[in-house]
């Protein structure tokens, strides 16, 4: 058990971070890495790194974000590698561009791993306290963060403040029709006074909600009635610094709801907090409660329920798929209607939690607020949902909070073409959100480039140049790049004719022209393993280098075209839009987009991109239209 810190030696910090969740931990560590004297304030030190909802990290798009956080020397990847008990790569039947690393975690092991990292971090102190307010000074005529006030009355001076409050900002828990309980998580008090302070400083707060399912007793489940779901035979670590997964691996299991389950839920919808107008705020669209599933999809006879162990030594199981705010007795009845759970014991009931968030359009791409200099938001306060989304915002907010202390440092901003984190932040600050925002591969225009395997190649050097990445990690990247370059050179120097290939049972276009080994990788049926069979000397390279170059070679022609598209897109960001443009003539533009553009009359592509509701696809259509218009004008002249 960690000692509680009641006092701190100094009363002034460069950066103060409020919240010890996934966003707060990454923000505090990032600020400390850049060199700022940083203080992390959390209401309970023992809850640092707590997985409030599902015991898992990663998934489709989300897993790429974890890799990106790790590439920037973040914490999440290292922590999950010490706690993973069921690891898998989702979408393995599809291309690497949509692979999604995911790991079930031992809750206690993850929390311990994160606390071990945070409590021993250089330049970072941790204080157990509650922040109730913050003050500002005027800097060049604009308000700027000056201090934070604790519930005990103590004032801490700081030049930069990161709020990563999660579901605690004005948090309220609901179960059934009972009166809501003020809490950010079951058993933990909310940050009510801080929410009022934000309002006093001119921020308009909205409300969102999320939910969690009951926890059930492992020993009361009839596992023979469920389907086993094994993890990957060789677990893949999240961190580029991890050699292997250390904990034993276990299976997850699948069962399904049925018509009886749905009847029980349907008969009690009027008693569920989420459906009884007690919590009339937006819920996560892509992680709905069982009440929402039954109501929105009446044609479905069943829904999957994933039974996920919460730890190697824990008797608690997380039934993923039945998040609920029904009364407790209804929750148990509903669970016992599911195959394999007929005699299940409930260890903890499910609930809905509603909380405050701020319209993320009030932020710059650095996640600094437009209203107050030095004030940054990260995580669910920006309208997102998910551990991974929170961590990605945390690392950007913390880094920029520290970098902004010096005029010699440029802001750390990730573009949509550079990272899923960049896609997410750009979506948030330009489009805003009216419901909990979640990342998907479909949100990224350049997902062929934004893969989980190359996050370090994309971001580590960028982070190193910003002072965010350690010499050790940069050295690992440098060595990896050197080996990959040697391998690519070897593949370009090695060639073979189609005729010789055919003798080996490999058939390509019989035009007589020699093909280099690297060019062969672009053939649909040729993999790096086949090249190794042809040229065994390639085995002298590491499996990591062979895998990375294999993917790059497979996608090489497409990546080259995409790189040209990205460069063209960036150049056209400042391209002017003629005042006489008719948006009704732009092919592929929705009526809604046409109306918004007509009203706003943006003068450039960049200005059009920042109109709420105008998607990247719409921008691409406008660019194509302007190109065609330009060519037609040139031909006519």
From Swiss-Prot:
TM segment ranges: none
GO MF annotations in UniProt: flavin adenine dinucleotide binding
Binding site for FAD: 19-24, 131, 191, 380
Annotated compartments: Cytoplasm
UniProtKB keywords: Cytoplasm, FAD, Flavoprotein, NAD, tRNA processing
Binding, NAD(+): 283-297
Highest taxon of the lineage: Bacteria
Similarity-based family: Belongs to the MnmG family.
PANTHER family noted in UniProt: GLUCOSE INHIBITED DIVISION PROTEIN A, PROTEIN MTO1 HOMOLOG, MITOCHONDRIAL
NCBIfam families, alphabetized: mnmG_gidA
Protein name, as recorded: tRNA uridine 5-carboxymethylaminomethyl modification enzyme MnmG
Classification of source organism: Bacteria, Pseudomonadati, Pseudomonadota, Alphaproteobacteria, Rickettsiales
């Amino acid at each position: 058990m960690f000692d509680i810190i009641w006092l701190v030696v100094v009363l002034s910090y460069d950066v103060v971070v409020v919240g010890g969740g996934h966003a707060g931990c990454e923000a505090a560590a990032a600020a400390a890495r850049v060199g700022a004297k940083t203080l992390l304030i959390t209401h309970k030190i023992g809850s640092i790194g707590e997985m409030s909802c599902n015991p898992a990290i990663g998934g489709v798009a989300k897993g790429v974000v974890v890799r990106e956080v790790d590439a920037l020397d973040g914490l999440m990847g290292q922590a999950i590698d010490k706690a993973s008990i069921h690891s898998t790569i989702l979408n393995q039947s599809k291309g690497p561009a949509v692979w999604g690393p995911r790991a079930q975690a031992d809750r206690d092991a993850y929390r311990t791993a994160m606390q071990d990292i945070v409590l021993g971090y250089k330049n970072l102190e941790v204080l157990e306290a509650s922040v109730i307010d913050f003050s500002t000074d005027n800097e060049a005529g604009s308000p700027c963060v000056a201090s934070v006030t604790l519930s005990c009355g103590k004032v801490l001076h700081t030049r930069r403040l990161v709020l990563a409050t999660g579901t605690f900002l004005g948090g309220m828990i609901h179960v059934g029709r009972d009166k809501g309980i003020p809490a950010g998580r079951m058993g933990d008090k909310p940050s009510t006074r801080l929410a009022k302070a934000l309002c006093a400083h001119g921020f308009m707060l909205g409300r969102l909600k999320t939910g969690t399912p009951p926890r059930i007793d492992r020993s009361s489940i009839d596992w023979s009635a469920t389907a086993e779901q094994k993890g990957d035979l060789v677990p893949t670590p999240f961190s580029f610094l991890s050699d292997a997964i250390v904990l034993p691996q276990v299976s997850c299991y699948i069962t399904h709801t049925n018509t009886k389950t749905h009847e029980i839920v349907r008969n009690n919808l009027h008693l569920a907090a989420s459906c009884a107008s007690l919590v009339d705020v937006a819920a996560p669209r892509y992680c709905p409660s069982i009440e929402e599933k039954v109501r929105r999809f009446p044609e479905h006879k069943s829904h999957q329920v994933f039974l996920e162990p919460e730890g190697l030594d824990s008797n608690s199981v997380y039934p993923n798929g039945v998040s609920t705010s029904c009364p407790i007795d209804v929750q148990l009845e509903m669970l016992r209607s599911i195959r394999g759970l007929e005699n299940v014991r409930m260890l903890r009931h499910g609930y809905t939690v509603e909380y405050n968030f701020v319209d993320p359009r009030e932020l710059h791409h650095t996640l600094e607020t437009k209203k107050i200099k030095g004030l940054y938001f990260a995580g669910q306060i920006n309208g997102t949902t998910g551990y991974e989304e929170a961590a990605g915002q945390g690392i950007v907010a913390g880094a920029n909070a520290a970098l902004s202390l010096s005029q010699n440092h440029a802001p750390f901003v990730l573009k949509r073409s550079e990272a899923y984190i960049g896609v997410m932040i750009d979506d948030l600050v330009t489009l805003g959100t009216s419901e909990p925002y979640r990342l998907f591969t479909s949100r990224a225009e350049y997902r062929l480039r934004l893969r989980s395997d190359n996050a370090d190649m994309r971001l580590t050097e960028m982070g190193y140049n910003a002072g965010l990445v350690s010499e050790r990690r940069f050295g690992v990247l440098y060595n990896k790049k050197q080996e990959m370059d040697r391998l690519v050179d070897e593949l370009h120097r090695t060639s073979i004719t189609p005729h010789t290939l055919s003798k080996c049972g490999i058939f390509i276009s019989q035009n007589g022209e020699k093909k280099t080994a690297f060019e062969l990788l672009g053939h649909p049926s040729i993999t790096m393993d086949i090249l190794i069979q042809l040229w065994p000397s390639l085995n002298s390279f590491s499996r990591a280098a062979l895998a990375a170059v294999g993917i790059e070679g497979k996608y090489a022609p497409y990546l080259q075209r995409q790189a040209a598209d990205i460069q063209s897109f960036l150049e056209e960001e400042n391209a002017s839009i003629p005042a006489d443009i008719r948006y009704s003539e732009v092919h592929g533009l929705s009526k809604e987009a046409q109306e918004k553009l007509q009203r706003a009359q943006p003068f450039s592509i960049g200005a059009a991109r920042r109109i709420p509701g105008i998607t990247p696809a719409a921008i691409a259509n406008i660019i194509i239209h302007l190109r065609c218009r330009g060519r037609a004008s040139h031909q006519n002249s």
